[in-house]
Amino acid sequence: MNLLMEIELMQSKKKNCMYIIIAILAIAALLGFDQWTKHLAVVYLKDKPNIVLIQGVLELEYLENRGAAFGILQNQQWLFAILTVLFLGISFYVFWKVPKTSRYMPIFCVFIVLASGAIGNFIDRLREKYVVDFIYFNLINFPIFNVADIYLTLSVVTIFILILFVYKDEDYDMIFGKRSKDGV
């Protein structure tokens, strides 16, 4: 290996290391904010009347959610644990495979936010056997949710937008390797 190749390899490793450090710090910050808001909900909302922020639109209401979104799959902690670990594994695989260039920065950021939301609710499930929800958008009688749910929802919507309007087949080839003309 010549000197130029060694320098390029070292620069690539340094860049990857920087991205990993940024991702860890960003996840820690987002996760910290999620957990802090849930702590505030426990302290100021549990066993207390709702706090109306905008009459008829937005309230803070404490809820211990033992299910998934919209209250489905109540008390299925083992299923949530398996799905979360699987989901995080896929997220970190994609994160690892995405080229560390400005072209793929949106997907890099989305997976940071996605992982933060998944880990935030996972921590609650492991620690308390339920997730603390506290944001109630009652204008449309939407289910009560939390900051981690916002992270997850925005990430999924953004992924669909990126898939539909930003990234093309060449991008997927770049991330996951060449595919045949059949897409296999």
Where are these regions (language model features)?
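Alpha-helical transmembrane bundles and membrane-interface segments of multipass inner-membrane proteins
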Residues: 2-184
